[in-house]
C-alpha cells in the first residue's frame, strides 16, 4: 500500500525506514555472483563484513555473514576472489544502510569460470568480433605507441626496453593501471579511452605478465572486449605467456605471445631496416649498372655499323649506283633508237619496193580506160577507145588501134 503524505502532514524518518525495510525484506533470499573486496574480520566479533563488487559495472554491495560461513570457504576467500553467495537483502533503519545477509558462500572454481568464458567466447564469435576481416593492420612505423600495463611491472620494462632498442626514436605513451582485482577493468577502460582519443597514438599495447586464471580475468571482461573492438586505434594484446589465452587475444587486432613479442611486432628493428635498405640499394645499383652496360654495348654496336662509322660511304655507293643506272639507261635508249631507226629505213625500203611508183620507175606503164579502170587484158578494149597511159614521169592520152 503506497504511503501518503503532504507538506502539512509529512512522514517521519522511522516510517520511511520501516517501509523500506518491509519492501526489501519481501525480496527473499537470492543467489548473487560477484568479486570479493574489503574483507573485514574484526577480533571478538562473529560477523564478517565484506564488499561484493560487480565484475563488469562499477556497482558494489555491502555483505555481512557469520564468521563460520567465511571460515568454511577456507583460504580461497581473499580480495579479488570470484564467489557466488546466497543471502537476503536487508535494510538497517538505525543506520539507513542496505546489506546482503549471507548464509552460504561458494567459491567460483576454475571449471565454472572456464565454462562462463567459453559461453562468452561463443557469443562474441557469433557476433563476428573474432573475424580476421575486421582486424586492422599495424602501422609500419608508429609516431607514438600507447602502453597500458601495471605500475613498475616487468611487462612495462620488457615493452619499453625492447621497443627503444629496436627503434630508439619511438615515443611511448604510458598508462599505468591495475592489471588484476576489482579495479582493473575500469582503469584499463579509462586508459584505453584516453589513448584512443589521442590522434598521435597509432597503436595501443595492453600488456601484463603471466598469472592464474583469476588474475587474468579482467582481460576476458566483456566490457573491455567490446571497447577494444570499438576503438579507432589498432590494439595489440600481450597478456601473460604463450599458453595464456584471455579473450582479449581474440578481439585484439594482433595477438603477441609475450610483452617482448609485442615490442617486436609494434616497431621495426632499425638495424634490420638499415640492412634491408642497404640490400635494396645494392640490388638497385647492380640492376642499374647492368642496364647501363647493356645500353653501352648496344650503343657501341650501333656506332660500329658501317652506316654510322662512315655515313658518306653509303652516299658515295648510292651515287655510283645512280651513275651506273644512268649510263645503262642511256645506252639502252641509244640502242633502242638505233634499232628503231634501222627498222624504219628497212620498212621505208620495203614500202618503196612495193609502191606502184617504183614499178613505173622501172619502165612499166599503167593503162586506164575512160572510166579510170586499169586495163589488164587486150580484150577489155576495142579499137578507137580512148586510153590514159600513166608512166613514171606522168600521164598522156592514147587511142587503141
UniProtKB/Swiss-Prot annotation:
Pfam families named among the record's database cross-references: Exonuc_VII_L, tRNA_anti_2
Domain of life per record: Bacteria
Reaction catalyzed: Exonucleolytic cleavage in either 5'- to 3'- or 3'- to 5'-direction to yield nucleoside 5'-phosphates
Keywords in alphabetical order: Cytoplasm, Exonuclease, Hydrolase, Nuclease
Subcellular location as annotated: Cytoplasm
Example of a GO MF term: exodeoxyribonuclease VII activity
A GO cellular-component term linked to this record: cytoplasm
EC identifiers of the protein: 3.1.11.6
InterPro entries registered for this protein in UniProt: Exonuc_VII_L (IPR003753), Exonuc_VII_lsu_C (IPR020579), OB-fold_nuc-bd_dom (IPR025824)
Isomerase among keywords: no
Biological processes per GO annotation: DNA catabolic process
Function as written in the Swiss-Prot or TrEMBL entry: Bidirectionally degrades single-stranded DNA into large acid-insoluble oligonucleotides, which are then degraded further into small acid-soluble oligonucleotides.
Known partners and oligomeric status: Heterooligomer composed of large and small subunits.
UniProt similarity note: Belongs to the XseA family.
Name of the featured protein: Exodeoxyribonuclease 7 large subunit
